[in-house]
Amino acid sequence: MNKRKILVPLGEKSYEVTLEAGILNNISEELLKIGITKKRKILVISNEEISNLYGKKFLNNLKDNKFQAKMFLIKAGESYKNLKTLSEIYDVAFEFGLDRNSIIIALGGGIVGDVSGFAAATWLRGIEYIQIPTTLLSMVDSSVGGKTGVNHPKGKNLIGAFNQPKAVFIDPETLKSLPKREFSAGMAEVIKYGVIRDKELFEYLEIDKNKNELINLKNEYLIKIINSSIKTKSHVVSQDEHENGVRAILNYGHSFGHVIENLCGYGKFLHGEAISIGMNIAGKIAIEKGLWSKEELERQRVLLESYDLPTEIPKINKEDVLTILMGDKKVRDGKMRFILPKEIGAVDIYDDVEDSLFLKFFS
């Protein structure tokens, strides 16, 4: 399988995403290629499930090639993406003697990547880190773009930093052991890219043959959609690293998705499932504002559901919805900003959406 390389062009902070089936088996070689010498200490952060699948083999690969490496396992689940977990990482970093020339490797899904990246941003005022995402959602979304952080009891990702990785390595082979529900959750983000910027990708995902090959985890098809998704994200991030403008379009479906995650309790819906419902709500608002057609909303709904994603809006208290939305990071000068579709392949940012326009979708 051919190796794909995607540049994320951010001046001095530019880096490459390397996408290849089986790349985890040659990780030591890949690290040497990007200048990670064997003198540098490596702290690999993962979780128990990933460690059992790939982590031990990964760590042994590093040690067999004379890298000074240690692995620390954090607990899996959104409820552990917090300051306590971060503090535990700092303790291990101190005991291991992680200095400014050391490096952190995040081996796992989005939670591992977010926490590891923030630990790297804050340990000794910042050390380098590498993302090795093992879920579809983290491959196409959280591993690229430099958003790192932890949750606060009042909301998701309220504590964090923009911290670009030194490199990202993606091995689609890791998706073979991903639970089907987790794979579907990742497809929500892939479909999102189709709606916001890539009509061709959206249409590719609608074709039954492609759908079947993706569900059966054929590398060639996985690489195609991961490559397309990352190219879109890279292009947007390179224009607006710190989300002061156009980067906000990557949050399509996320404002309402975060509301659903928060009010239904973290864990009821996977992140991608909540985003799927959020995209359906955003699509309904777009119809109310006359931005796109019922046919386009229906195409989005059918595509989401064909990858086993939920679109039905759960019963949630309207007042709670407003409270959560006003605490959203996308609020500017007291105004909520919504990412709404104009057509398949194009969205825009709107701050003139009346509360009544979206509250009617909640009971």
Swiss-Prot record:
Cellular location(s): Cytoplasm
Pathway: Metabolic intermediate biosynthesis; chorismate biosynthesis; chorismate from D-erythrose 4-phosphate and phosphoenolpyruvate: step 2/7
Cofactor binding summary note: Binds 1 divalent metal cation per subunit. Can use either Co(2+) or Zn(2+).
Enzyme class: lyase
The entry's keywords: Amino-acid biosynthesis, Aromatic amino acid biosynthesis, Cobalt, Cytoplasm, Lyase, Metal-binding, NAD, Nucleotide-binding, Zinc
InterPro entries: Dehydroquinate_synthase (IPR050071), DHQ_synth_AroB (IPR016037), DHQ_synth_fam (IPR030963), DHQS/DOIS_N (IPR030960), DHQS_C (IPR056179)
Keyword DNA-binding: no
Cofactor(s) the record lists: Co(2+); Zn(2+); NAD(+)
Binding site for NAD(+): 134-135, 147, 156
Reaction(s) catalysed (UniProt annotation): 7-phospho-2-dehydro-3-deoxy-D-arabino-heptonate = 3-dehydroquinate + phosphate
NCBIfam families hit by this protein: aroB
Protein name per its UniProtKB record: 3-dehydroquinate synthase
